[in-house]
Amino acid sequence: MNNEKILTRWIVEKLGLDKLEVITSDMLEGYTSIGNGAFAYHNTLTSISIPNSITSIGNEAFRECISLTSISIGNSVTSIGHDAFKDCYSITSITLPNTITSIGYYAFCGCYDLTTINIPSSISKISMFAFMKNRNIKNVVIGDKNYELQTVVNSKCKAYKAFNADLTCRGFQYEEGKTYEMDENPELCIRGFHACLNLLDVFNYYNGVFGEDVVVHEVELDGVSDEKNKGNSKVVAKKITIGKRIL
């Protein structure tokens, strides 16, 4: 028996939820998923609490909710669809529950006021452009796991700061079309944190983002400067290690 109950845009409008500034968890209790585009372009929404009955947030579910500042995501959500919170300019922080396993492409793209992201250890897939254009991110918190990955940084690339000085990882940028081993073989897609302009110390490389040839002047692998990989050479990081504290 299928007990799925989707909160669709039609239901949102029928219940008058599209007219509210604050939506509490009891208003959504009993639904199992927030459907595609359910609250998209709801310009007056400032706060929403997603109850534990919800297991998934659909594509474009909250796209361009430009006044949204506060999100509480219940402890049953396992997936966030593509563009789910795209261009929610006013969000300042995100804490994802330990049940989340995947974040879709462009999910938090354009959240300009976002300064902190908490990514739990349950995450197995962060899709391309998931946090693109988040120019004010200062802290990324990764769950309590140590990851060993392979990455390739191309020679003609634009360097963006990513994470902070304590992180041993260098280059949160992955070669397109490949799957990288991380614990139980999760997949991290190309440019997961592309265009995070103001992050600290660790570079996120992107090939030709503005059509200009920006040379890599210094690359650090496992926290040690690699003199051999200056200039136009291809940079291959043998190991990326992500610690278990604020990075």
What residues fall within each predicted segment?
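N-terminal capping/linker segments that flank leucine-rich repeat
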Residues: 1-37, 50, 136-179, 184-192, ...
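Structural signature of tandem-repeat unit edges
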Residues: 1-6, 14-33, 43-56, 66-79, ...
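Consensus positions within tandem repeat domains that build extended binding/scaffold surfaces
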Residues: 11, 35-40, 58-63, 81-86, ...
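Intrinsically disordered, low-complexity, compositionally biased regions/tails
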Residues: 20, 39-41, 62-64, 78, ...
